[in-house]
């Protein structure tokens, strides 16, 4: 195979079929249509996104789910394209890549995730993947709330029962119908990602928002209950520090240090 750099390869059409397994975890490519022409800047970004050198406790799949979740939270279409192209090149299923972006919606908001999804679909189209992908929805209008409460309770236990009992009447539409029905019913129930993977994705998404330490702490604890470790959470932050920046990364690390379950 021609010895392209990762940056060159991921700017080509059909990137996912050109990159071999030997390139797994290599650096992200700059958008070929970028207005930035700064090789030094690109070289630093390449170094910081070389996933084989980052996140030692995580699988390559987990690393890409973390990166996709952070991209979804930040809301930049070009970053969505690059994160998706890299994940495709490392063998992640198109549906799982899309799912990681979908999953961020109740946390980052659907305006941001829609923008990132546009970039994801650009990468998939370039790789010859037919869209739309197969539906992963498993709930209906009639059962989404019930199914959402079930998975929410599976993760958080009796906290959910107590919350439902103590939520004031004027907030029940928001805290039960929307939180349980939309966030958990519409998204957590979907096929493709495990609950542990979804909680890791949620942690990364909230960390990228910044200033949401109460929610970040709750989901850090949920990660531990689902079988993820503190090392997994710190390593996910290390994978994505190049896009998180240090202030949000260090704040998230402090949350992990304090969390128990």
What label would you give each PLM region?
Residues 99, 108-111:
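Substrate/cofactor-recognition hotspot
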Residues 53, 74-78, 92, 210, ...:
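Residues in soluble alpha-helical coiled-coils and helical-bundle/repeat scaffolds
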Residues 2-4, 9-62, 78-85, 89, ...:
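Acidic, glycine/proline-rich low-complexity segments that act as flexible tails and inter-domain linkers
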Residues 70-77, 108-109, 205-212, 245:
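Short alpha-helix boundary/capping elements
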Residues 88-100, 222-235, 240:
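Short, mixed-charge aromatic SLiMs
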Residues 62-71, 97-101, 197-207, 216, ...:
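Short, structured motif recognition centered on aromatic/hydrophobic residues
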Residues 194-203, 207-231:
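Glycine/small-residue-rich hydrophobic helix-like segments
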